[in-house]
Amino acid sequence: MPQVKNLRVSGRIGPLIFYYVGDKFYARAAPGKIKQAPKTKTRSTNFGIASRAGKALRDGLADALPNTKDRQMQSRFSGAIAKWLGLQSVKTLTGPAEIPGLFLFMFGGHVAFEEKFRAPFTVSIKSEEAIEIHVPAFIPAKVMSGPDDTLSVECTFAVASCDLAIGRLLENKLVRWNIAYDNNIVPAQTFTLPCPHPPGSLMVVTGGLRFNALKRGIPVMSEDPSYISCSVIKTVVNVERAGG
């Protein structure tokens, strides 16, 4: 077998890599190139898109979320977006009226908003610039179940939209509605939240409840997860792209 002594070279020559460690010389085979299958590459790309979009939407909804630092919630939310994207291209998106995994997604609490707030509200898309939430007249003590000595309920509606291709937050809005917890009729309410969601965007609307009750004679917002609710009540994906 031929031998070469006093070789003073480092780097790659053909399929071999030459290098020194201390005063010793070594050679090893260069690693082969790994080529991703098209489906694997698409999934990897979409996972990155979902991660960026998830963060952008969470940032936009932050004031409505019970705990923005919940790592499990963050992972579940981005994972739900990634699962929906699957092998789709953001340039040719498709999506049902309500995206499975995202619609009714729980940001906090034990019960979805629609189960905790039993008034038959509706969420309508007015245009590419706004949404409208309508709540008919209701009696608070009959459509919500609060802890003992509940004084009032803080109801929040929030919306955020993002550009999926670049994961940029486009717009976000929040409305807080303080409702006395009693047997008096609350008149019908309509909330209009401006939120542009142009072609190529994903928009998420959430509903949330927190109960304000007496604790040792002092009004405090309940921290019991049984009386906290924040979940997705509407998803909208605008699939049409100019020139597409």
Sequence positions of predicted segments:
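Long, polar/Ser/Thr-enriched low-complexity segments
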Residues: 1-113, 243
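Hydrophobic, glycine-enriched assembly/anchoring segments
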Residues: 3, 10-12, 221-244
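Charged linear interaction tracts used for macromolecular binding and regulation
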Residues: 85-230
